[in-house]
């Protein structure tokens, strides 16, 4: 329990920020799932389109500090690799 006004304010800010970050992560997961579903269906065109939509969301997550930039790069790289394998 906070004993100072500033500590109470920090608690309010943390709650607000947590909600924003949770929504952002959920949104990113949704976009990644769409790409994975398109890959699983074997539709390269749909997978490419979903990947194109997911890419800025993932990068935004890195910019906002929700995900580490290396994590985002790794996810994008692996998704792209799987999409390219569809055509081969």
Swiss-Prot record:
Entry's Gene Ontology BP terms: translation
Protein keywords: Ribonucleoprotein, Ribosomal protein, RNA-binding, rRNA-binding
SUPFAM superfamilies: Ribosomal protein S20 (SSF46992)
Name of the protein this chain belongs to: Small ribosomal subunit protein bS20
Gene of this entry: rpsT
Single annotated GO MF: small ribosomal subunit rRNA binding
Cited Gene3D superfamilies: Ribosomal protein S20
Family recorded in the similarity comment: Belongs to the bacterial ribosomal protein bS20 family.
GO annotation, cellular component aspect: small ribosomal subunit
InterPro entries with a match to the protein in the record: Ribosomal_bS20, Ribosomal_bS20_sf
